[in-house]
Structure formats: C-alpha cells, structure tokens
Amino acid sequence: MSIQTELTRITNAKAAIKTAIEGKGVTVPEATLLDGMASLIESIEAGGGATEPYIEEVVDGNGDITNATLHGYTIIRSYAFYMCSKLALASLSSGITSIGNYAFYNCSKLALASLPSGLTSIRNYAFYNCSELALTSLPSGITSIGDNAFYMCSKLALTSLPSGLTSIRNNAFYTCLGLDSLTFEGKPKSISSSAFKGCANITTINVPWAPGAVANAPWGAINATINYNFTGAW
C-alpha cells in the first residue's frame, strides 16, 4: 500500500469519526487531530451533548442494577428492567407515554411515588410482582391496562380509575390487597371478568353507569358491593 493511499484512508476515517461524533450533538473543531477525538467520544458516553436517548445505571458490586435514570425516552421497551429485583427507582422521566410488556417484571424493590403525567398505556405484566409499588393514583390520560399489569402489587393504594380508561385486561390487579374502595371516573369499554381477581379487600366499587352496561361485574372482586350512579350520560 502506497503512502498516499494510507494517508487517504486515514483522512477518510477521521472524516467518518467526525461525522459520527457531530451526529450525537458534540461539536468537533476543525483542527482536532484524530487522537484528540477520544475525549469527545467519552463526552458522548457520559451523555454530554447527546441527542439520542440513553440510560444511566447504578450497579452494585455484583453487577445488579440498583437505580437508573432514563434520558430522552418516551417508551420503556419490553423487558427493559426484567427481573431487576434490586432496582429501587423512585421516579420516571416526564416524557414517558408507554410502559412495555414485562418492563418492570418482578422488580420487588421498585417504589415509584407516581407515574408520568403523559402516560397512556401500561402493557402486559408491566409491574408484575412489584410488591413495594404503592401508587395512590394513575395519570388521567391512561387508556389501557394490560394483562397482569399490576399482578400482586400488594401495596397499590388506588382509590379511583381515570375517566379515559377504556380497557382493563385479565388479572390486571390480581391480588392487589391494598385496594379497598374504588371509584370509576369514566366508563371503560371492557373490563375483564378477572380484572380484580384476588382483591379480597375491595368492598365497594362506585361506577357512573347502569347495571349491565359493562359486562362481567364484579370483575373478580367477589367481596365488593357495586354502587351504580347512572345519570343518563352513558
């Protein structure tokens, strides 16, 4: 290989690296040498100037994730923190709109104080067996709650379900023993016959529709009395 060919190859490589770095939102001065780009790459890895979504994770000595911060994400992908039993996340970034299947499956130390206000969808098994999850409310924009979404979340302390909710799937709140009285603020299109299965402490469910308007009552909450408060709006 000639010297000229080698110089051309190096020049092209430098140009490609420069383009890649600048694509992440980090400016590369024209006079920067090839070996001087290392610090700029480190800046990207640390999140500095990055425009792509990224996650900062805290791990313990065994390599288990104990905390995480999500930057720039709108969706938490399926299995994102699957079986992270030491994850003690206290909050999620405000831009999250959907939580995927099995996203926090068996995250037994997860203690979120609230969910992002823009959240619309909680998918299947999203918070399965998150036994420390003690939410007292759900975002007003929630439209669907998937199969086993809050399965055995025994500290869940919801008192109402938002008006925009259209679907509650199978075993969505299975054995959520912290639930005792629930008020529906709107009328879902469908509620599974097992949505509240095992919720032995639910004694009252208040709904703004007439008897029979939503099938499968009492939706698995066998100890509940349903108060129908139909006003003619449905």
PLM feature spans:
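Surface-exposed receptor/substrate recognition regions of extracellular proteins
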Residues: 1-63, 75, 181, 204-205
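Short glycine-/small-residue-rich flexible loop motifs, especially phosphate/cofactor-binding loops
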Residues: 18, 78, 101, 170, ...
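Structural signature of tandem-repeat unit edges
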Residues: 52-75, 85-98, 108-121, 131-144, ...
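Compositionally biased, low-hydrophobicity segments enriched in charged and small polar residues
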Residues: 1-2, 191-197
